[in-house]
Amino acid sequence: MSLRSLLITTEAVGETTQTSDHQTSFSTRTYNEINDRPSLRVEKDGEKAYCFKNLDPVRYDTRMGEYPFDYGGQSTENNQLQFDLFTKDLMADTDIGLSDDVRDDLKRQIKEYYQQGYRAIFLIRPQNQEQQYIASYSSTNLNFTSQLSVGVNLSVLNKIQENKLHIYSTQPHIPSVGCEMITKIFRTDVDNENSLINYSVPVTVTISVTKATFEDTFVWNQNNDYPNMNYKDLIPAVTKNSIYHDVKRITKIHEYINSKKKKNGVGKIGGIQIAESKDGFWKILTKNYQIKLKFGIEGYGVMGGTFGNWLIDSGFKTVETNYEYQRNGKTINATTVASVKPSRKCGTRSPVFGQLQFSGEMMVLSHNDILTVFYTEREWALSNAIYAKNFATDFKRQFEVTAQSDELLVRTNVVPHTIKNTPGKALMEYSHGGFGQIDTSDYTGMALTFRFRCVSEDLPEGYYDKDKALTFANVGLTSFQDRQETNGTYWVYNTSTVGFGSCYPKKEFEYDINVTYTTLLPSDPEFTTGGTNYAQSVTAVLEESFINLQNQVNEMLTRMNISDLTSGVMSVFSVATSFPQILDGISDLLKAASSAFKKVKGKVGNVAKRLRGKRYVRLFDEDISIEETPRFLDSIRSSRRPSILSNMFNDDETFTALHTLASRTNSVASDVTYIQPIITTRIANSTPPVIAPASSVTYAKLKDISKIINAEIDPKSIMEFNQVSNTISILDSTKKLAQYAVDPDVIDGILNKMVGGHARSLFSLKVRKHLLDAVEKDAFVKYNYHDLMGKLLNDRELLDITNNLSSQKQFELAKEFRDLLINALA
């Protein structure tokens, strides 16, 4: 059974592809056509008439926003339940400093929104929600303070009529927190500069508008206590799209809030349904939850070199955390997935140190780097949502990530096996949040996202006190000299970086957070959008398999010196012509691996790189264009090589070479390995360089390439399309070899239009030229073009040359083969 037959048999798992029909596809129903259709249509059947509502899908524009939102005008379209107009942070006992222009603009905006049925919300959030505080207003003829309060408080201005303020508030007494802002903005009998507002603790003041309506908590007639108070009437218009809250509903919410009050008066909201609106099949739901966010940050390091004393790879893992906690007397099963994207390194990578000494660099979570945490629960509204928006949270806390130097995960093979290091410290702060897709061991679907930014200072080398010096990370050395200067400072090395190093074990963090968001859900609970119904654990198992495979490849690559790799390549080619025939039971395994790989391809960043471009498939009754990067498998399926490429390794031999070397974690032996499904699937989806005569490339694509490289292409040329380095190389009939860097999508487009006439190669044209030059320095001079191609594209003759290569040529050969292997398996 050949490799081509095996892979073609096992590739088509649950889909139909069309590789020859490469024309542009158009949908028979456009968005404009749907918009032009009437909302109701009448059809007659004899004497009977039937009325149908237009059930074509409605397009919803969603966004992921930061909270609080910036001050400024917002869209007036009715596609948002609530959004902010103004926000400001205030220190304790400091006037809000609202200028006349800002106050007038706010008043104008609020008046316009009231004409559309909105209400204004005045929300006060103290920085320390366990600290008691009061709000106060003072002017020439009116002074008042709220009662002592704790936590977040809000007041909704339902309307102003006949100098009476109709207010819904989270506080039952008059005046409530928020009334001071209402009075400052809407009073007409006093100048803005003569009215002052302050709070006894640091707070954030937010003014927003909402479509929801609330029953009045109280009606405040200030003239009863303070005569001559003047307000202009402000009455919201009644619209059919308003979301109504009756007294019973608000009372129920208040009873729930009061039941959660602690003895010290701190309000803990576990989960409140703020608003709900139904329209046909769908409903819009706004909810508030108190969640426990628990996540981990875990690093890794890989040692390599001849004796395993060099740190050749490091970084942070994607950490999945499954945990339980109590909310409202119920056990909540939650999952978080945390990932760190470091951008800087510390340490020194210097091969001149020798194989017996430590050398290497460690990735560092440093200034402006991002930590992203995805959160989901086993049962909640978001899991069955079509989309979500208006994410908000009260989390403002900073936290520090650090470790002990003796926790370093990597060791050398030289006594005493330890490596000097300083873990450093990273100060993290909540940046913004929103929504995203998550793929965990037991859930696939929508999740909340929390993004934390490292706010540690970006400091250069120099003299610092010890506390500051300990915030620098380093490996191979401590971050600073042991000797203390006379002024009490220490010299920090230039190989150090402020932040937290990656080669340390898992550190866990846990915080209580309030979140609010709006979702679109099916109004009938019998309808489902999937949620956990399609959450397959196979994706997690497959990811773990890929990680294990990557670790094996890293270990194999790092433990091979140049001669090992070169001899390993030679050993591989010695068995390349004998493709492993041990295929008992492999078809089912390969089919499962191929199917699972498709499910996660492009979805999880560290499992498989997202493939580019389009691919043409038939889905139901429509042609869908999903062009992707052409793979090794595509070449196998359409392999019809011209005679000029006949002496290159065929597909079976090339595949066997990659598979055999990838299957070993030490120096390559001469025996044949059993075929491994995961490795087979990855190599089948890899992209080794493509070598083809110019005649195999369509005329239109040759013209496109000519424009890119600004030169005409000789029709007798041999061309190489390298998807590893994103380059095109051309060897023309004058025996001139030129290489051009191009956009990867250009290569994809060329290969997608190429039907056969090419071969996947283990080596580039550049390395082939170097191999030939090693034994025949004047080969490009003395041979004519036809004979030169015969030697340059003869894999077996080139491999015989490798035993006579210089150290530099061996290094180039090994480096290219290593890059090719990483491309196939990483």
From Swiss-Prot:
Q: Which UniProt keywords apply?
A: Capsid protein, Hemagglutinin, Host cell membrane, Host endoplasmic reticulum, Host membrane, Host-virus interaction, Membrane, Outer capsid protein, Viral attachment to host cell, Viral penetration into host cytoplasm, Viral penetration via permeabilization of host membrane, Virion, Virus entry into host cell
Q: What is this protein called?
A: Outer capsid protein VP4
A cellular component term from Gene Ontology for this protein is: host cell plasma membrane
Q: Does the keyword Membrane apply?
A: yes
Q: Which domain of life is it from?
A: Viruses
Q: Which InterPro entries match?
A: Rota_A_VP4, Rota_VP4_MID, Rota_VP4_MID_sf
User: Which chain positions carry the site (Probable cleavage)?
Assistant: R249, I250, K262, K263
Q: Which family does it belong to?
A: Belongs to the rotavirus VP4 family.
Q: Name one GO biological process term.
A: virion attachment to host cell
